[in-house]
Amino acid sequence: MKRLIAIILVVTAVLLSACNSSSSVNVAEAKSIADLKGAKIAAQTGTFHAEAMKQIEGNTADTYPEFSDMLTALKSGAIDGYIAEEPTALAVCPTDNTLDYLRLVNNTTGFTATEKQTGVAIAVKKGSDLVARINAVLAEISAETRYNLMLQMADISAGKSVTALALSSEAPENPTGTLKIAMECAYEPYNWTDLNNPTIGAVPIYDQNGNVKEGQYANGYDVQIAQYVANKLGLKLEIYAYDWESLVPAVQSGAVDGIVAGMSPTPEREEQVDFTDMYYTSNLVVIYKKK
């Protein structure tokens, strides 16, 4: 009886392993998403990426709550790759020589997507006058400056040194209020957490009780955009770390004033919050593990 149980356990483990293993598709050789047929390409839960993954024929991968979870799944062989914006790939791949990404272009070799689906905007509470005020500030930032800032943030997150940021402004001497911004602080190069040693432009992270988290600093493209907006509006910036699924509820409840977290203004989200103009647009790519 014990021997039979042992055999059953072994068979079950093998079957589970097979179910959770990657496919036989060589992602590295793909030239378009059509070449990814049958591959297991994951995406983050609650994002447009989760819809885009359905464009890959025969894709059986699951969605994951965080990018770190997808990276773990990729490393373990549970998936063949995962969808990300190109800036994320620029931040992740140079720091790990086992990873690379497919340089796909939206609506040609890559995923079918509108600018609204692949662009990111700042979310605020429904009816807030912050939309117009923030849009006026964003209009001052040229496309070249936005691109150069993103490259810098990718470099910083990859451990490279940057001496001066492409986008900066003087903080107000006498702020007229506080701009509370929520983000994950875990989505390089858009936003991440520095521990103990803040990189250039990093700011303290606050907990949900309004207290500074000791030794934790937020940095990234989103942080620099938020800092620039706050400075131009004459406000003090405070960054709050939230799980992705808690970001929209935080704005709706009034716990924070806005979300700057690499968030796309999907129709579903537009029913819950108001969005500003885009502050960055990008191609969707697929990060994979080299064979």
Describe each PLM feature range.
Residues 2-10:
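Sec-dependent signal peptide recognition
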Residues 14-18:
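C-terminal motif of bacterial Sec signal peptides marking the signal peptidase cleavage site
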Residues 20, 45-47, 112-161, 225-232, ...:
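Extended ligand-binding regions for polar small-molecule ligands
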Residues 22-36, 87-117, 231, 236-291:
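Acidic, polar ligand-binding/catalytic clefts
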Residues 25-33, 150-177:
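Bacterial Sec-exported substrate-binding components of ABC uptake systems
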Residues 40-43, 55-56, 60-67, 72-76, ...:
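Extracytoplasmic small-molecule ligand-binding "clamshell" domains
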Residues 51-56, 93-95:
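Short loop/helix-cap segments at secondary-structure boundaries that form the rim of catalytic
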